[in-house]
């Protein structure tokens, strides 16, 4: 039986998940409709569709595993349920982070303007960067799937053996780190590109101020808005993996639903918050969302009039 605090936090997690799924579904549908209309899909459009679809799967897996862990923890030890969930999770989570990294790099190379020779080389060879990241993703999958299979087999064999669990704490943490090396690489690349873009925008704003453009200059406002979006993304991105770390640590603790659900809240903040940030920060998505809201409002008004 859940306590009042645990019940409230679980409602918060569920709300985050619903908002995240709705936001990502809208992003995917809007870009698919744009492709159907123009018969052409940009790199950003392709990345947004892939990011939205993979993140919908990630959210469903997080919620499914979270509810099972809270209400039916013993089900996870039956058959191959844990194994199937883990494999799907690894595939979708790596793919989601890969798409997010590609999106950050694409925005970085498109917006930033450094005189560094490495940056100029990367900017002229965007396709090479994507191919390299694709190779990193495949390598990460090939390395982590066998390791996860070994970890799951060991946990099945010794499940319930308290002494074995105590002995395997350090081994488990090392294995978790090794299996997530690919994720760590993409996280570092995303945060570095995000930081460099923030630095570029900050320098550009200072340069515009020194030239006497003023705070109300449209370009300055756009740059400030972009900086806020980037900082929000970085915070949510970090919180997502902090939440995942909390869930992993719960493996070593007696059943603590409050801590576990807190980890779920932090984990679900990123897919929910980032989808909203993408919609508000993208002109086409923002216009499409406003049209959708206007359409829903009109439908609701007509429905109320017909009832009366």
Swiss-Prot record:
Disulfide bond entries: none
Positions of transmembrane segments: 8-28, 44-64, 95-115, 128-148, 181-201, 233-253, 259-279
Which Pfam families does the entry mention?
A: TAS2R
Give me the Extracellular side stretches, as residue ranges. 1-7, 65-94, 149-180, 254-258
Give compartment(s): Membrane
Q: Which residues lie on this side of the membrane: Cytoplasmic?
A: 29-43, 116-127, 202-232, 280-308
Main localization category? membrane
The protein's matches in InterPro entries, at most eight in alphabetical order, are given as: TAS2R
- Family under the similarity heading: Belongs to the G-protein coupled receptor T2R family.
Protein name as annotated: Taste receptor type 2 member 107
Q: What is the lineage of its organism?
A: Eukaryota, Metazoa, Chordata, Craniata, Vertebrata
């Amino acid at each position: 039986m859940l306590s009042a605090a645990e019940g409230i936090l679980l409602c918060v997690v569920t709300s985050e998940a619903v908002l995240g799924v709705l936001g990502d579904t809208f992003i995917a549908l809007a870009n698919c409709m744009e492709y159907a209309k123009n018969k052409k899909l940009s790199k950003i459009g392709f990345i947004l569709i892939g990011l939205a679809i993979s993140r919908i799967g990630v959210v469903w897996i997080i919620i499914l595993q979270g509810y099972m862990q809270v209400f039916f923890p013993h089900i996870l030890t039956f058959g191959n349920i844990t194994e199937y969930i883990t494999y799907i999770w690894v595939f979708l989570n790596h793919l989601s982070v890969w798409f997010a990294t590609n999106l950050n790099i694409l925005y970085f190379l498109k917006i930033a303007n450094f005189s560094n020779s490495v940056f100029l080389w990367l900017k002229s060879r965007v396709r090479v960067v994507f191919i390299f990241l694709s190779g990193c993703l495949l390598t990460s999958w090939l390395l982590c799937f066998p390791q996860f299979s070994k970890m799951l087999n060991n946990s099945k064999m010794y499940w319930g053996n308290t002494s074995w669990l105590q002995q395997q704490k350090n081994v488990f943490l090392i294995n978790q780190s090794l299996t997530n090396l690919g994720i760590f690489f993409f996280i570092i690349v995303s945060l570095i590109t995000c930081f460099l873009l923030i630095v570029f925008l900050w320098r550009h704003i200072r340069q515009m101020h020194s030239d006497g453009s003023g705070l109300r200059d449209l370009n300055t406002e756009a740059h400030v808005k972009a900086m806020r979006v980037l900082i929000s993304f970085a915070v949510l991105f970090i919180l997502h993996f902090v939440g995942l770390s909390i869930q992993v640590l719960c493996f070593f603790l007696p059943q603590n639903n409050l801590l576990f659900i807190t980890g779920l809240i932090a984990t679900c903040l990123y897919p929910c918050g980032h989808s909203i940030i993408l919609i508000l920060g993208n002109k086409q998505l923002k216009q499409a969302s406003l049209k959708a809201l206007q359409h829903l409002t009109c439908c609701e008004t007509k429905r109320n009039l017909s009832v009366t």
